[in-house]
Amino acid sequence: MRAEAPIEEVVRDADMRVTSIAVDHDDVPAVAYRIEHGGHAIVVSGDLASKNDNLVRLAAGADVLVYDTAVRDPPGSAPGLYSLHTPPKRIGEVAAAAHVRSLVLSHLPPAVEHAREEVLASVRAGYAGPVRFANDCMRIDLPAP
């Protein structure tokens, strides 16, 4: 994957726009998506190691960034996973650099689930906005634009 990929339009109609960008997931192709509707934007990272700023560009100013949180900070997860997934400290840095309004941590394996306080503290070291852990059927209400 190129260090800086273009943002591509996937869908556009009168009410909604979906864009995507290639993200770093070792040698496995992966993309992140931005969904815009009604004056709001939600970005879903997909699996990524975040070794470049592609997600920062796609997520710029988003209301919500849903971020793959499949590893703990090193050495808390298997070494091979760090070429595929973003450590919590870097997640906080990406969210702050993109100036997102809130962050939802998703794709939570047991190692992350059992270390929520540690993971949250690490994310908050770089990002001061609201942070939530995702759960099935979660609903996020957004204020009127």
Question: Can you say where each PLM-predicted feature lies in the sequence?
Answer:
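Core dinuclear metal-dependent hydrolase active-site scaffold
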Residues: 1-57, 136-145
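Cap/insert and terminal regions of metallo-dependent hydrolase folds
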Residues: 41, 49-138
